[in-house]
Amino acid sequence: VANVAQISDAVEITESDIYLSFLPFSHTFERTVAHYAALAHGASMAFARSVQHIENDLADVQPTIMCTVPRVLERLYQKQQLELAKGSEVEQHRSQWAAEAGWRRFCRDNGLPIEPSAREALDETVLPVLDEDVGRKVRGLFGGRMKAILCGGASLNQSVARYFCAMGVPLRQVYGLTETS
């Protein structure tokens, strides 16, 4: 019960939320958030067919909340980067600029220090356009309606976390001891 209350303090869960569950039921983190917290707040739960089908399930279900492990996010990141590498030089440049400007926005929004950049003065002008073009596609990998992705089980690669946060993916790294749950 205490863990459900703590989750509720971190993520607002409502009856309109859809939780996508794909981690094993034996995973305490998954069970606490996906099952107990979702049920406590009347949220809907969808069960992924398997981790191998997670991309299709994200698109089909369009969840608002999910728990994951770093490997799943790293796989989605790698796939996105491979697709980007196939694009034109202009598309690659736009994506890089979107990541840089998005990271500065994330830092500003969260009170973190901002790395100096000559492009910083243009952020307010170009970020809405870049976000619509690039960020929306990245958020679309997660179904396009995600309000919280909780990643635990191991530490997430900093480059992956930074990229998704820069693209407006609502990602949170979480930590907890299974034996205290």
Annotated model-derived regions:
Residues 71, 115-116, 147, 152-160, ...:
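Conserved A3 ("GATE") glycine/threonine-rich loop of ANL adenylate-forming enzymes
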Residues 23-27, 176-179:
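AMP-binding (ANL) adenylation modules
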Residues 23, 127, 149, 153:
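Glycine- and other small-residue-rich loops at beta-strand/loop junctions that grip anionic moieties
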Residues 8, 18-20, 40, 151, ...:
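Residue-level signal for pocket-adjacent positions within structured domains
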Residues 2-18, 25-135, 145:
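Conserved AMP-binding/adenylation subdomain of ANL enzymes
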Residues 138:
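Phosphate/pyrophosphate-binding loop motifs in nucleotide- or prenyl diphosphate-using proteins
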